[in-house]
């Protein structure tokens, strides 16, 4: 403090006190150059602006730093964390959680509320108005205990601190402050409230009892309903399939709880079951988002009305309503239209659907699953393109096509592609006759693939459209087979063999290259005009009249045969000129009367006679001599190279012969060594046998360590001491060494 007194004068202190009384906070730390703690920290204590705060661990104060729960900097920290979490949450979708603060204003006395009296509790606002949330069975709950009513309020989010007569106002304020701090830190009241945990345990017991009741009910009619209800793997909810299995079996399979108005008037009835609590707002938000996603799909309401004529009181007709038709705006290529086999995971069809009657007023039905007479109920086919062509596309309906089944996979098609298909169906119905249909089928069966402009009628189709219309107009084939045929025929678009080839000397021909792209299957993403720069397409003539008769071709366009022959001869001459050497060009320029072959290859006598027959100038004679000299040198060089090549080839053959001899000798050596080893083994066995039979005067065998056998020159065998045998062996080893020296 002594070092600070020389900086802080009396006037400065008075001025600082005056500003602090006014409310202005002065920071004089910038004027101080000492290493002591700043003035603000001395007066007000440490702050997060001047200390290293551990933002990830506020309660850890082992290193001397941290934020106190009652510090003024705590609000700034939570604000920064909240903003940071909002920024991080921008890249993912979050369903907002609704918190409803409900306060009990008036409550009837116990026992006065009946089950039939309308509940005066809370109501949630939905798209259809105010609907009761508690349901008809909450009246009985209200007549039980006060604790049960409070539990219902806690489920709605109206959680207030418990008020008791023993707590003072200061205690209530302190509890409220601590509770809000816990919420800011991420811990809700359900962590500390015992009654809330008890409530969750009771709810779990009720759900378990409901599951047991459902198991007993499923033994009677659950098999019929299981074919029509699909269970979500994440939430466990049951929702109806797009095609009801049997109309008569549905009312029997519905439980008795469907008569309650809570299921019919619930906020999210299409996806809520009878056992779920309507107070779970977070679950209701998730169900609402799933309903919005289902409404974005292409669903035909007319088919649902025809296929399922339910009574007015049927809960399936009231709860599971189909969404209206909406445009399909997803940009998905048709190359991805083929899906994997889904025989077990995607049970969309049932055998009862195949037998449902459909209207047959139209002659050419669009390609939808309802037009097929051999639908595969297990989806064994891997090509599901037949499901992607409903007649009602983007609001353009075909009234004569008959009722259709709802298409859950219609969202996978491009909108522009669907417009083209719908216009194609209209063109078929307006001006397409059976004769044109037969012609079109013949063109499909041709080996040359699909041809463009094959018919000049107003209803003629292009290659890609024709293949799609043929598959969509067949009402006798299955959806999978027709779809696979349509896409298999698309691959034939490209080249046509109907164009005639010209009988040219260079085998030049006109190739029927398709100038426009295919709408479905593009064979190449390059511009056809870029192919003209390729060298091997230099002589290719693009003739796009290959669909016409051969007699209709204009003969004036073909050049006369004489010009063709002249052109071919000129090309041959140019080719020969390119192959000529420099001496040949010089001889032609000097007008030499004979060829270079005669100049080079004729013998000396014949060459002199040839020169004497013609009157040649000195320049011609010198050129002829140079050509002969260079030719002879060239021939000599060729002969030299030939001799060298022959020598190299002879050496190569000799080396190969030596390698073969070496391999043969190595094989013989191996055989000799093997035979020698066998002989040594036989001699050793014989030596042991003979030595084992020898006995001394007393009839005892000789010791192998003291005696050894020695073969004599005459074939006899001698028994000598081991020392003498070793000396003789060493002497025999020294003799070859002395010879080498």
From Swiss-Prot:
This is Endoplasmic reticulum membrane sensor NFE2L1. Residues 625-644 are annotated as: Basic motif. Residues 651-665 are annotated as: Leucine-zipper. The gene is Nfe2l1. Glycans are attached at residues 319, 331, 394. It comes from Mus musculus. Disruption phenotype: Embryonic lethality: embryos progress normally to the late egg cylinder stage at approximately 6.5 days post coitus (dpc), but development is arrested before 7.5 dpc. Mutant embryos fail to form a primitive streak and lack detectable mesoderm. Homozygous embryos suffer from anemia as a result of abnormal fetal liver erythropoiesis. No defect in globin gene expression are detected; abnormal red cell production being the result of a defect in the fetal liver microenvironment specific for erythroid cells. Residues 350-354 are annotated as: CPD. Isoform 1: Widely expressed including kidney, brown fat, white fat, large intestine, small intestine, stomach, lung, brain and liver. Isoform 1: Expressed in mouse embryonic fibroblasts (MEF). Isoform 2: Widely expressed including kidney, brown fat, white fat, large intestine, small intestine, stomach, lung, brain and liver. Isoform 2: levels in white fat, lung and liver are increased compared to isoform 1 (at protein level). Isoform 2: levels are elevated in brown fat and brain, but are reduced in liver compared to isoform 1 levels. Isoform 2: Expressed in mouse embryonic fibroblasts (MEF). Residues 732-741 have a biased composition (Basic residues). The lineage of its organism: Eukaryota, Metazoa, Chordata, Craniata, Vertebrata. A motif (Nuclear localization signal) lies at residues 730-737. SMART domains: BRLZ. The keyword Magnesium does not apply. Changing residue 496 to A: Does not affect phosphorylation by CK2. Changing residue 497 to A: Abolishes phosphorylation by CK2. Residues 447-492 have a biased composition (Low complexity).
